[in-house]
Each structure stands twice: as structure tokens, then as C-alpha cells.
């Protein structure tokens, strides 16, 4: 996988297109059922987006993409990861398993409700932690509503305005 969310059936890049580029097809390869990798990478770079998993090693206990069948064998040390990204002020989780893993690495008392955030520390860093709806089409929410949730991240006071495309 050369970039995050390459699956044609996942709506993450369509949501970004709706928020920033005037339409959900903006990051698709014209006339093809795939996302344009060059457009995606350029967009993520221009908007200061970085991606990483909360697990380095996982085991699927069943042949199913659901979090309930995912066992984290080696979690990512998110505090260490953030030490290499000093300008990062916000972290987003979408899945339940990722949120559960991040919770144990923070001083947050609970996982934020979907569509909300909390201020917490990951290691010594003060971070705004957002819990967003899954961009999978299996998650029962219209893409436009998901985009409304994600738009809040980019409108928050912590998001770097110079790189946000506004």
C-alpha cells in the first residue's frame, strides 16, 4: 500500500474532496475506479496531513475486516511517533480498536464520542484527540454527514491555518 485509504470503497478521500476541493470525485483518477495517488499525496502534503496506524502488528482472528476480529499484537508507541512530528497538534481515530489503543496511551478519561474531541496528553505532548466516524461504507452514515464531522477538525483552533487550504 503506497498511501492510506487506497480502497475504492472507502470514502476518506471523497470526504476530503467534499471539504476542500468542491466535490467527492476530486481525488479520483479520471475515468477509473481508483484514487489518483499523486493527487492524494500532493493534497495530504499541502494540508499537513500525516497518517499512521495505532498498531505495528495485528492478527485477524477471522477473515473479516471488523475491529472485533482484530487483535493488536504490537501497538504503536504514539508518544514516540509524535516526538518526530513536533508541529502535530491533533490526532484522529476512526475505528473502535484504534480508539481503545490510543486511550491507554493518553491521560484522557474516556474515548471521545464520535464527532467530538478531547484535550489530553500523549507522553508530554498536549494533543487534541478527535474521534471521527469510520469512512468505510459499512459505517451507517451518509458521506455528506461524515464530511460535516471531519470539517470540524480543519476548523479547530489547533489546525495550522496556513496549510489548511482556506
Region spans (language model):
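Short, surface-exposed acidic-centric catalytic microdomains
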Residues: 2-70
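C-terminal capping/extension of enzyme domains
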Residues: 6-8, 15, 62-79, 103-166
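Alpha-helix initiation/capping motif
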Residues: 10, 36, 95-96, 142
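Secondary-structure boundary/capping positions in well-ordered alpha/beta enzyme cores
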Residues: 23, 88-89, 109
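Short, mixed-charge, low-aromatic patches
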Residues: 33-38, 101-109
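Generic structural signal for beta-strand residues in well-ordered domains
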Residues: 42-44, 84, 122
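Internal catalytic-core helix/loop-beta-alpha segment
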Residues: 46-105
Amino acid at each position: 500500500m503506497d498511501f492510506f485509504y487506497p480502497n475504492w470503497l472507502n470514502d476518506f478521500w471523497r470526504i476530503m474532496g467534499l471539504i476542500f476541493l468542491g466535490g467527492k470525485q476530486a481525488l479520483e483518477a479520471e475515468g477509473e475506479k481508483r484514487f489518483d495517488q499523486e493527487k492524494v499525496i500532493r493534497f495530504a502534503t499541502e494540508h499537513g496531513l500525516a497518517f499512521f496506524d495505532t498498531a505495528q502488528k495485528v492478527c485477524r482472528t477471522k477473515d473479516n475486516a471488523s475491529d472485533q476480529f482484530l487483535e493488536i499484537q504490537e501497538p504503536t508507541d504514539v508518544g514516540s511517533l509524535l516526538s518526530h512530528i513536533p508541529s502535530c497538534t491533533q490526532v484522529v481515530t476512526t475505528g473502535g480498536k484504534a480508539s481503545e489503543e490510543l486511550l491507554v496511551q493518553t491521560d484522557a478519561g474516556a474515548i471521545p464520542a464520535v464527532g467530538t474531541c478531547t484535550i489530553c496528553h500523549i507522553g508530554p505532548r498536549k494533543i487534541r484527540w478527535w474521534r471521527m466516524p469510520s469512512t468505510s461504507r459499512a459505517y451507517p452514515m451518509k458521506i455528506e454527514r461524515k464530511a460535516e464531522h471531519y470539517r470540524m477538525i480543519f476548523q479547530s483552533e489547533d489546525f495550522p491555518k496556513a496549510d489548511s487550504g482556506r
